[in-house]
Each structure stands twice: as C-alpha cells, then as structure tokens.
Amino acid sequence: MDKSDFVELQSKTINFLRFPMAIAVVFIHTHADVGNLVDADFKFFSWQGIYNVVGVLFSHVLSHIAVPLFFFISGLLFFINFREWSWLRYRKKIKSRIYTLIIPYILWNLIPFLLFLLGYMVIGVKNHSLEEIKNFLYSTNINLFYDYHSWETVTNWFGKKVVMSGPFNFPLWFLRDLIFVSVLTPLIYYLINKLKVIFIILLLFAYLSNVWISIPGLSVLACFFYSLGAYISINLINVFAILKKYRKIVLTTSLILLFVSVVYDGMNTIIGSFFYPFFIIFMSSCVFYFAFLFVDKSHLMVGNTLISSCFFIYVFHCMPLPLFGNLNHLIRVFLLKIMPGQSPVDMVIVYFANPLFTVAICVFLFRILTMFLPRVSGAFMGNR
C-alpha cells in the first residue's frame, strides 16, 4: 500500500470510528447501578448478575476508550503534513479551531447556563432573594467555562484519588482539554523533536501511574494521547503496520485486561485503577486496528449525516436543562415509567434503550437544526 492509499484509508477509518465513539460517550453517562464482581452479593448466573456485567462492561469499561481515541485522533490530524515547524501553519490551524472548538465550547456552556439561570430566577424567586441570585452569579464567574464541576476518578500509584473537573456542561471537559493541548502544540512539537520517543515514554509513565500535575485543562489523558498521535504523525509512523505485526499480542492482552477490568469495575476500585490505563491503551489499539481492517476489506462507511451529528450528540446528550436535568436522564425516567416492572430484565432493556433513544433524538434534532437554522447550527457546531 503506497502512502496516498494509506492516508486515505486512515482518514476513512477515523470517520468510521466517529459515530460509534459518540455512542460510547453516551454509554459512559448512562446510569448503571452496578459494582465490582468480587464484592457482589448476587449470583453471577442470574439476571441481576447479567445486568451488573452488562452495565460495567459498557458504561465503566469498553466505552472509556472513546475519549482517549478522540484525543489520539486529534493529535494525529493536527500534525498531518507537519514535518517541520511552521508558525504560519500553526496560526492557520489555531484560527480554524477558534471556530471549530472555542466558539462552540463557549456557546454550549453559556446557553444552558442562561437557561438554568432563567429557570432559577423564575421558579426559585419565591425561595431565593435577588441578593442570593447575585451571589450565585458572582461565585460562578469564570468557573462556568473552566471547573464548575469536579469529581474523583482513578486512584494513582501513591493511593491518592485523582480529581477531574469540567465546565457547566460537564462532558465538555474533553473540549476544554483539547483546546489547551492544541494551543500548546508548539511545546509538544519542540519536546517531540528534542526528546524523541523519551518524551512519549515519560508521558506514558505519567498516564499509567496517574502521577501528574493537577491543573484543569491539562489532564494526563489529553497530554499523553494527543502527544502520541502527534508523535506518530510527525514521524510518519505506519501504526497499522506495527499493530498488524503484533496483533496477536495486542488482541490477547486486550481480552485479558478486559476481563480483569470488568471484574474490578473499571477504574472504580483500587485494583481496577491499576489495570485501567493498560486496558485503555491495548483496547484502543485493538479497536483502531480492527476498524482499519474492516474499512479496508468491506468498504462500508457510516452515513455523512451520522458522522456530522457526532459533535451535537456529544455536546447535547448531557447538557443541563432547567427542570429536566438532561436529555439522557429524562429518557431514562420516561423508560422506567413505561416499563411494566423493575426486574433485572427490565433494567437491562432500559439500560440499552436509554442511550440508543438519546442518540436517535440527538440525530433528529441535529437534522432539524441544520435544515431550518443552518447559520445558527453552523456557529454551534463549528461549521461541521
């Protein structure tokens, strides 16, 4: 396969992965009342056991490869045809990201906040004085776009819980971190150029150990996978040739780590936190390789409408809505009300129906917006 064919196939593979990864992100935020199998007080071969395994597998383990892959692909694409540093090319790329990343990031945090504030003032005015509302606005300020929410994630090698943060529309922490690493590409390029693979090894150790600086916007996840993609792109590495050579090792290790991660509930236990980053690296590699093979052999592609709707699915599925919470939560509440019971079988059905209905509604709303409000949707979607 010559270089032009490889680049084209790589581009098709990336486009093929976008929609499944968007669905995976919705699964991450789909509620699953589950726990690790070691401490389980139910029979494994029961509907409760099946529901637990399904919930852990899809919401706590498999779906978590989506965000690292998005960062990896972003680094890969930023440095395509970027063999030597060019400030002119950098400014051009950053300028385009003002429209594709920064403006949508601001809008998708500001609009839900204003809606939330409106509901807070109209409905809560009887319970809250104007002074309380004023203090609420004052305390929010820049946190709205930076670190409005915070939550604990993995346990690092020193036994300390790693704290993540996100803006008002909390899934957009990915977009925030992507903006940061995109701006820092001159530094990333310099370190790759000077330290070579040592730079990637250092970031790999930081990612595996989760020993890292605590600065919102500079997560080790973003820095490692974005830089890895950049390194591969800058050095013209044929990642598929490498994965093909070691495919048996990658696949076998991925399956072993998948089993361990499901047993120990992903990153939600101390043991799970140790294996979790290893699983992410191997399973992401595995998915990327087999997606490449599938596209190459079948020539099947995801429809343009579904690919174009990925960004809308990502920003809207958990967007805070006054009174309702968010779309994903609203659909879950609705499904639980119409189901005949609350048995584990019902819960499995609701669990899968929830994200699928959420995605379907998001795609429908996206089509309506692009058809009737193309300029508005263009601004909100970064002209995607």
Give short role names for the model-derived ranges.
Residues 200-210, 248-264, 284-289, 355-368:
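Hydrophobic core of alpha-helical transmembrane segments in multi-pass integral membrane proteins
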Residues 78-86, 186-194, 228-240, 263-264, ...:
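Structural signal for the C-terminal ends of transmembrane alpha-helices
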Residues 184-189, 197-237:
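Loop-centered beta-sheet repeat module
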Residues 5, 50, 224, 235-312, ...:
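Alpha-helical transmembrane segments and terminal signal-anchor/GPI-anchor hydrophobic tails
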Residues 1-203, 331-384:
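Membrane-cytosol interface segments of multi-pass membrane proteins
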Residues 25-32, 313-321:
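Histidine-centered catalytic micro-motifs
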Residues 17-20, 191-202, 213, 217, ...:
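Membrane-interface starts of transmembrane alpha-helices
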Residues 55-68, 161-177, 209-227, 262-286, ...:
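Interfacial loop-to-helix transition and helix-capping segments at the boundaries
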